[in-house]
Amino acid sequence: VTGTAAMLISALFISSLRKYITEDTISNFMDNRYNKRVGYLYSYAYLLMGFIYIPIQLFTITTIFRTIMPNLSLTWACIIGLILAISYTVISGISGANYVSKISCILMYALMAVGLFIVLVKTSGIPNMKANLAPSYFTPFSMPTKTWFSWFLTTLVAFLTMQAAIQPSLIAKDDSNARRGIVFGALLNLPCGFICALLGMACMTMNLDVQGISSMAFATVINTYCPPLLTSAIFASIGLIVICTLAGQLLAIGTIFRQLLQPVYNKNNFSDKKTLTITRVITFVYGLLTIIPTFAVQQSALNQLVTVLVACVTGPMFFSLLAGMYWKQMNSTAASWSIISGIVTGVIWVVTGMSAAWHPVYIILPVSSVVGFIVCKLTSKNGIAEV
């Protein structure tokens, strides 16, 4: 629900984003609006985030692979997932990934609806859940407000500042098509949470063994109660969606690499074909290297890790991006300090363990915004040269 609400609100900004981000990367906008240093700050922060974010996405596809093939090691599952995603990226591009993702999403919902019906029938449905689970599972607002609101803020910020999230909108035919795509994606996103929640509750009700990893609940309950053919179809559709999502992330990474290396390409007079080939090879190597942190990520903490990671990288960019579009007085000095202060604050918040009590998005957004505003006012008033 929070994701859908955030996506719908982000659609309100799409015309401005397309108006000001005239090239294909946010880092280019930062470069043109401020200076190269600000553009590099965005690019390097995004590449660092991708190095951790891609393994998190890989866990979903590896869970599916290892459910179907129990003897498959985590390493090989990761390699297969990455090769499929990178190959898909090379073949289809972002337009193909978006189109196939939407078709697969509709197919997945249809299959999951059938799977949910079968699971509920075989587990005695909602009455059995109510008899075995705490009442809080059936109360919409049992989750603390600060938790779900942090998810909403993080998702909203991510949809406005993440290259992978905004790239499809930037290449859309016009503002209307871009906005329509966001609304369609938001509506497709909504049912998934409810279906997965019910399947997870069924898994808990029947005390199925998920090895202490909550992310295994979905695959376990589907594999236990659904017919093999339906199980395979559900896993295949989900796997394709995850691969499309991963492909979109790799496309964004590749776009940023190309932008960073463009001066080198121009200096050596590389052709477009050679430029594309080199960028793809670098992206492929980068993708393979992301297998390394995969083994350091705790599967039991995936949901929290995703929102914390995204908040710590995209949150510091939020003020600089929006102020750059709507506030003419905003300068590169203020943008640099806003981003740096946000990143440093996020790192300190996580390292000191304070993120366990309060999500870092609550401190990153106000700190980076206040620092950016104050520095902008000081530099403008005193005529301090921009960095």
Residues of each region from the PLM?
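Membrane-embedded helix-loop-helix hairpins and adjacent transmembrane boundary segments
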Residues: 1-387
